[in-house]
Each structure stands twice: as C-alpha cells, then as structure tokens.
Amino acid sequence: MKKIVFVLTLMLFSFGTLGQETASGQVGDVSSSTIATEVSEAECGTQSATTQGENDWDWCCELCCNPACFGC
C-alpha cells in the first residue's frame, strides 16, 4: 500500500513539473520565432535597399526563408 501511495505521489509531482516545462517551452518558442522573423525582415530590407530587381527578392526569400518576402 505504501508503494502505491509513493508511486501516485511521485506521478503527481512529475506531472506538475512536466506541465510547467511544456508551458514555458511554448512561450519561448513563440518569442524566439518572433525575434527570428524580425531579424529576417531586417536582412531582407537591407538587401533590397542595396540592389534592385525581382531576382533580389527571390534570393532574399531563399536566404532568409521569410514568408514576408514577396513571392514566397
């Protein structure tokens, strides 16, 4: 009986810990993807300012993998 109570208690504590790690991981993923998108947009903006033409936007999309670029 003590083993069963111990196992159940252990399961409850581990479930709470895993839930917190999952929630914090999801929040971190959202913020890191937002930062990556902003950096990609900045790189694409500097590239398009230095050269002109539709091929430049294609190169930008291939390099940045940024869905905000035209044609991606």
Curated annotation (Swiss-Prot):
Coiled coil: none annotated. Disulfide bonds join 60-65, 61-69, 64-72. Pfam families: Enterotoxin_ST (PF02048). It comes from the Bacteria. Keywords: Disulfide bond, Enterotoxin, Secreted, Signal, Toxin, Virulence. One of its GO terms (cellular component) is extracellular space. InterPro entries: Heat-stable_enterotox_CS, Heat-stable_enterotox_STa. Residues 1-19 form the signal peptide. GO terms for molecular function: toxin activity. PROSITE patterns: ENTEROTOXIN_H_STABLE (PS00273). Belongs to the heat-stable enterotoxin family. Toxin which activates the particulate form of guanylate cyclase and increases cyclic GMP levels within the host intestinal epithelial cells. Highly toxic. This is Heat-stable enterotoxin C. The gene is ystC.
